């Protein structure tokens, strides 16, 4: 730690930089500052997290950095980019458009083993997190100039196969790209720095004792400020409202709907069953050890809010109310008539399947992208939506919430809330990003007085953790507690 401090004192600040020759896009001033910061890290043998808001061009800045490395003769070994499967075509397209001089190899498909011996002949090698641990032996045999994790929160669990695999790879320099370096708890930040600069934040146990418990459990604001000071030199984070001032602001509208009749009765019966199940769990084990089972118990309650037909193994009467679907089918025809282009996000792929026949009945054109969509087809779907020929794009939160450029959309509908607000913000950023020239309207459909309403309260408190460590003087984190659970399982207020 002392040697790192001495090195930082002698490095000065990043120098102004010009865009590299052959860059296919004009870099904005803040993007040039980002490239200068990446060069500064490389020059001083440091690592870091480029954590700009979603949609501010982290890929463009990284490609410019790689192009400079090539033009100045330092890219004698390839750079390896590890990314989610859904982003492969985006990186391929962006590299071809922005930095055509970079030779790019994609490791994909059953015959990718044939490409392992060719990696050294390319400037950039792309692979995915699911393939990384399968191919780790071959990848570990090839040294790299730069190892980049795109959407680096994918290795936030230090014990995961992907996180263990990246630690086996050899590279001169390391970089994380993510719009959400911190989503749920401080352990995620530790995992990323343990990859970037092992030992910088201590081992997992000491980090838990010195930082996580004081900040997350005890709410010690001073400790949060001290941690922020320690990591700040290695995190570059800019916000849309600060640097992309030409972007119109997002207008967020919460559309609350009330459950009626049989759907309301179903909610109450599922709530009572979930409450009983959770009480039994807590009688047998401690709260922390039961959280996965508790989330599973809460799942049915969330499904009833979204649509009763999501509950498997239960025959629903034909007269069952479907409050959100009815609201959605009122909204979408009106939005399409106004000429709006709409992204509809749901965490439940099955919910999108339930929406499809309703759109057909209304003769509204639509497309869908889920985890079952083959990677090779995703680029064509995005291009078709961007061409403005189809007004409605149904997208599963997990498959399409990261990395896609969907600026043809001016309206985003979140059918169901998710525990982590950053996940929905990432999805919204598919439309609200550089290249968007229209105001963006975001609708969140929420069942009034239900578990969903209480999830919004939890989301607001979770945001305090991000603010406290990544750049504001926020208070400490709030964990998912037993008190929170009692609120989530509380009866719905009488209408």
Model-flagged regions — what are they?
Residues 2-220, 228-495:
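ASCE P-loop NTPase motor core, strongest for the SF2 helicase catalytic module
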Residues 224:
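Short, structured active-site-proximal loop/turn typified by the sulfatase FGly-forming signature C/S-X-P-X-R
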């Amino acid at each position: 730690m002392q040697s790192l401090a001495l090195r930082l004192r002698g490095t000065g600040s990043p120098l102004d930089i010009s865009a590299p020759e052959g860059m296919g896009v004009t870099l904005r001033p803040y993007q040039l500052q980002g490239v200068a910061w990446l060069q500064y890290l490389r020059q001083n043998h440091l690592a870091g997290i480029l954590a700009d808001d979603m949609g501010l061009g982290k890929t463009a800045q990284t490609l410019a950095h790689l192009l400079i490395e090539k033009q100045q003769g330092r890219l004698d070994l390839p750079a390896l980019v590890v990314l989610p499967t859904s982003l492969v075509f985006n990186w391929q397209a962006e590299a071809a458009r922005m930095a055509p001089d970079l030779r790019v190899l994609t490791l994909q498909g059953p015959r990718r083993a044939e490409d392992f011996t060719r990696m050294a002949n390319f400037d950039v090698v792309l692979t995915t997190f699911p393939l990384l641990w399968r191919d780790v032996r071959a990848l570990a045999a090839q040294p790299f100039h730069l190892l980049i994790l795109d959407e680096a929160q994918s290795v936030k669990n230090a014990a995961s196969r992907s996180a263990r695999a990246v630690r086996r790879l050899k590279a001169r320099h390391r970089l994380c790209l993510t719009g959400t370096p911190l989503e749920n708890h401080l352990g995620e930040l530790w995992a990323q720095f343990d990859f970037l600069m092992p030992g910088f934040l201590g081992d997992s146990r000491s980090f838990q004792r010195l930082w996580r418990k004081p900040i997350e459990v005890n709410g010690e604001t001073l400790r949060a400020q001290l941690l922020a000071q320690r990591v700040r030199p290695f995190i570059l984070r800019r916000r849309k409202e600060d640097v992309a001032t030409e972007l119109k602001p997002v207008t967020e509208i919460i559309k609350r709907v009330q459950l009626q009749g049989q759907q309301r009765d179903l909610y109450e019966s599922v709530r009572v069953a979930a409450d009983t199940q959770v009480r039994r769990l807590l009688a047998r084990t401690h709260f922390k050890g039961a959280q996965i089972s508790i989330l599973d118990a809460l799942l049915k309650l969330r499904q009833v809010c979204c649509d009763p037909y999501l509950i498997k193994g239960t025959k629903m009467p034909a007269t069952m109310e479907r409050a959100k679907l009815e609201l959605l089918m009122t909204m979408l025809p009106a939005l399409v008539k106004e000429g709006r282009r709409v992204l509809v996000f749901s965490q439940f792929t099955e919910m999108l399947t339930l929406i499809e026949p309703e759109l057909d009945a209304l003769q509204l054109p639509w497309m869908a992208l889920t985890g079952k969509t083959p990677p090779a087809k995703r680029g064509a779907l995005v291009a078709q939506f961007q061409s403005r020929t189809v007004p409605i794009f149904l997208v599963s939160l997990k498959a399409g919430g990261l990395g896609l450029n969907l600026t043809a959309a001016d309206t985003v509908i979140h059918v169901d809330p998710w525990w982590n607000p950053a996940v929905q913000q990432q999805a919204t950023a598919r439309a609200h990003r550089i290249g968007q020239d229209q105001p963006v309207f975001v609708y969140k459909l929420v069942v009034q007085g239900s578990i969903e309403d209480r999830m919004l309260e939890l989301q607001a408190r979770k945001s305090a953790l991000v603010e406290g460590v990544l750049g504001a003087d926020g208070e400490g984190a709030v964990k998912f507690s037993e008190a929170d659970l009692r609120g989530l399982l509380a009866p719905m207020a009488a209408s």
